């Protein structure tokens, strides 16, 4: 049996832009994607700390060092620039893998610059 486990998150990031006219997804600074080991087009959950909204989408790469967290498409109705969010990724793991999994927690500052990596 495989289990779906939390494996990484970008914690308390600030939404920098919202674009209703974009097809969909969330644009994330590539430095943060790398730190969290989230791939382009990987499914992510976004939990809005500011207003409680939650959604599923997929990750797109933003310019390195830009701090961009861009909410695109219909999701822009749920999240606005300035909102604080958690972006989380999950994966399927065997029982053995799940028991030793050490999720990555990427902490950022107010400008979405990497502060540190912490174990979950």
Swiss-Prot record:
Cofactor note: Binds 1 pyruvoyl group covalently per subunit.
GO molecular function: aspartate 1-decarboxylase activity
EC number(s) reported in the record: 4.1.1.11
Active site: residue positions: 25 (schiff-base intermediate with substrate), 58 (proton donor)
Organism: Deinococcus deserti (strain DSM 17065 / CIP 109153 / LMG 22923 / VCD115)
InterPro entries: Asp_de-COase-like_dom_sf, Asp_decarbox
Location in the cell: Cytoplasm
Pathway named in the protein's UniProt entry: Cofactor biosynthesis; (R)-pantothenate biosynthesis; beta-alanine from L-aspartate: step 1/1
Top-level EC class: lyase
Protein family according to the UniProt entry: Belongs to the PanD family.
Subunit structure: Heterooctamer of four alpha and four beta subunits.
Function noted in UniProt: Catalyzes the pyruvoyl-dependent decarboxylation of aspartate to produce beta-alanine.
Gene (name only): panD
Protein name: Aspartate 1-decarboxylase
PTM comment, free text: Is synthesized initially as an inactive proenzyme, which is activated by self-cleavage at a specific serine bond to produce a beta-subunit with a hydroxyl group at its C-terminus and an alpha-subunit with a pyruvoyl group at its N-terminus.
């Amino acid at each position: 049996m495989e289990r779906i486990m939390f494996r990484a998150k970008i914690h308390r990031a600030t939404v920098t832009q919202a674009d209703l006219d974009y097809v969909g997804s969330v644009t994330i600074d590539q430095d943060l994607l790398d730190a969290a080991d989230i791939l382009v087009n990987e499914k992510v959950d976004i939990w809005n700390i500011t207003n409680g909204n939650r959604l599923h989408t997929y990750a797109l790469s933003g310019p390195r060092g830009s701090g961009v967290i861009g909410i695109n498409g219909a999701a822009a109705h749920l999240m606005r620039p300035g909102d604080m969010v958690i972006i989380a990724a999950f994966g399927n793991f065997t029982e053995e893998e799940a028991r030793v999994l050490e999720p990555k927690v990427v902490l950022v500052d107010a400008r979405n610059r990497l502060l540190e990596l912490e174990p979950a």
